[in-house]
Amino acid sequence: MVSLNPFLEQSIIMNRNNETTETFSKLWVTAMITLTMMLPVNVACSQTKQQVPQQSIKTIYPTKDWAISDFVVTAPEFGAKAEPGFDNRVAFQAAIDAAYQSGGGVVYIPAGNYEFRSTQVGTKNVRVRQGRSETKKDFHFEYVLRLHPGVQLRGDWADPASHNGKVLGTILEVRVGKDSPNYDGSVESWWNDGQADNALRTTYTSIADRFIEMNAGTGVTNLSIWYPEQDIHHVKPYPWTLFQTQGDCATIERVTLVNSYNGFNSAPSELHYVLNSYMTALNKGIEVHVCTDIGRIENVRISPEYWANSGLPGAPSLEDVTAYTRANGTGYQMHRSDWEYVSYLYISGYKTGVWIGREPGFADAPNAQLYEVHVGGCGNGLYVEDVNPYGILISNSSFGAGQDGNAVYFYKDFSTSVQFNGVDFKGSVVGDGDGGVVSFESCTFSEYNDYALRMNRGNVLLSQCEFKKNAGHVYLGANMHTLKSVNSGYKSKLKVDNHSTSAKVEVITGKKYFFEPIPKNVKTNIDVHPRPVSDRVLKADLARATGFNNDRPVKDVSADLQSALDAVKAAGGGTLYLPAGRYLVNNPIKVPSGVELRGSWDVQHHTQSGGTAIFTNYDGGNAGESGPSLIQLEAHAGIRGITLAQLNIASDGFSVENPRKTPFLIQGQGPKVYIINVTIAVGDKGIDLASYDTSGHYVDYLGGVPLRAGIWVGGGAEGGFIRNMQLNPHYGSRLPEGGQGYPEVFMMRFVQSNCSALKFADVKNQTIFNNFVYGSVYGIHFLKDAITGKYPGEMTVIGHGSDGCTYSLFVEDADKDTKIVAINSELVNTKIPNEPVRSYVLMGDKVNTDKVHPDAKLILYNSAFWGSPVIGAIINNGIVSFQQANFSRSGTQGVDVRGGKAHVYTSYFAQKIAETTVKDEGYARLGAQGKSIEFTNNYYISGFRFNKSGEGLIYGSDKK
């Protein structure tokens, strides 16, 4: 319970740089603040103890949030020392173990240099392949630190970009592992692919040594890692610095890897997230293997400069480091990853900047979307060994070669799809692939030697691309199949050196084919990360369930929690911190303005890793699903690092087929509310940002399985951000150790037929970035605002993924001013029972609907469509433009214009159509009331096949 006992206190508050900023009187309240190791019991009540509220941990360097931790490695019970010669392995592991036993939390490392001089031994049990049989065998590896689920390491980090490259603050010195024979070890093994009906695969399982082993639901943030004994003139291999083993969610944020040999390895697992980090890696920076749910790389810089400019003893010259990495290193290496999201990745000075290809041992390759990826000064800026049929989307990026290098190289195994939109190439693009389509839209080519494009095989599309030289544009090798170009070249004149034996070459120019190019410089993140103005923290000791058991909390703490929140508000704002455990909140609470409700998580997380959770049976009472939300955020209030679970969603007369209807779990009630690193283990509805004007709202990494509604936005909000939403039914069925009282529900079928994941109504200047939903009727949905009566305005959607949906993108309502621009969309349908019609895009709910204005616009730049559509895209009204798309599967009709208009440019229709087809089957259909379809500069694997039943017009460069 929270003890309300106000008193007057004179304080001198220090800012994060330890400068005195103000002296003031404050009215504060006291609360029980105790540190209790998590025991396998249900904490049914709490004692009352008056104690002075605390400030957050004082850091030397700026932080995006306030630093909060119950476990400080230098505390006497752990004994870490920032002293030369002291081995910190035991002390750090003790703090990590304590945090784990307490249910999870942050282990804090104050600024200083901490040495590590010894290892521990781990065991990996592997299904070893022996011919066509298998056996289970243990392999040993060495590691220094093991992060258990729910535990995060956090230090005090100085951004090198703000300190002339200097590495300052918390530095982990690795003085063990030099010249390890098992620095990157693996063993041939068997593996069942859960994404392919458990098909048996041959692969290689890593048994490599590692410095920090990251298990499910772990994080490494705000620190630097340095190898003092590495010598650029005598480079020795070291084990992986950071190694994600398996399971969901490993996060690396605000980390500098000064001179790793190998940086971060994501072994077969899911949901890695590397962001806002820097590294010099001498061999490999980031390597990804068999990631079967969205991995994210965001704002990461990989370059020789971070070691050279570190200011640390023995730092070599930039020239010496670059000479080594340019001869030996790979910045980012992606093997099979399903839907990897890569944005704002910067790589320079490597042999290979970005490598994309197969898993060792079998042919599975990735699909991915890359946005604002910039590679320069590399032997191969981008090396493409192979890609799965769904393709790679690359937008608003640049690839540059060093001397005698290639901006892009396609290896002989490539035979699918890579799409470049708004990409600048400095150096040659060379293609030795075996087929497929490489397409370029609104791209530039410069600084090449003989030819900008040297394509020896396959098919190439060029649309509105600029070549900076008046010669040497395209070389076609003997086995080239197709080159199609519209309005491309030097001043729109394309020069082709054709050495093919039978290539189809089509070069067209004309003003009638001009189109609006992909938008540039789109803002995707907020300028200042939200947090309370005050750094004061009240740690509430409320009744909760704890331990690795299946206990649920029994006491409703709603009133105590509200009292604590109000107390923080009364004292001028700050953070109410709930340590790890399961809390029962059966009545609505309101987070006051200027207050943050915070749990044990500094990073994104999955249900399976425990931590702080709010359990509830609240269902809206007499008002039902129209009742108040469980957690209500006033203006400038937030919630961070917590999991929510609706306990009674499928009980007491309800089931997974008919789950309980409840209000939204979270509702924003004013401007600048924020929801960060929140997970919904299961709930009926997620976040309501539509009932009030929540201008400036910020949602980053909502994960989970809401059943009927994910995030709904409207109410006239302006300047909001919805980022990194990750909705997948497995959040409801993958439980933490011991179950920990979470309901185990398998909701795939229900959400596919009932959920509307993302809704946008009356919003302006909305940022919608790198979101993903698996299973929904409508993956992303645009409609008229139920409160203001207004329509969606102009907005840009970047990196949206809808998988397993009935309609992956649905525009239900739009007026003449509606303009929705989508970049790097991946839209997928799957066969869903009782859903007879499925399509990637639905514009309007019926033919010539008056809910969609004829001038309303939907423009999709650089898209990938696959799965099991009945019809690829259904246009009932308005104008839909496909500016580069891979229709891996197009259904009966790829683009079905029943009303309104469509434009299709630079697209690949990869589904083969037999010479004798069913009625109406084709890549396009213009219905009796459809106005027009333009087809310009596309590739059709079975030739241009279309159907027309009215007076509308089919035109474009492909219509002969």
What are these regions (language model features)?
Residues 110, 117, 148, 154-156, ...:
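Feature marks extracellular polysaccharide-active and adherence modules
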Residues 118-119, 163-166, 176, 229-236, ...:
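Short glycine/acidic-rich loop motifs that flank beta-strands on beta-rich extracellular proteins
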Residues 239, 659-662:
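Asp-box/WD-like beta-propeller blade repeats and closely related beta-sheet repeat scaffolds
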Residues 218, 247, 292, 338, ...:
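Small-residue (G/S/T/A) turn/hinge positions that recur once per unit in extracellular repeat modules
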Residues 3-18, 25-233, 253, 298-300, ...:
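Extracellular "leader-to-stem" segments immediately downstream of a signal peptide or signal-anchor
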Residues 75, 258-260, 581:
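Transmembrane beta-strand segments that form the barrel wall of outer-membrane beta-barrel proteins
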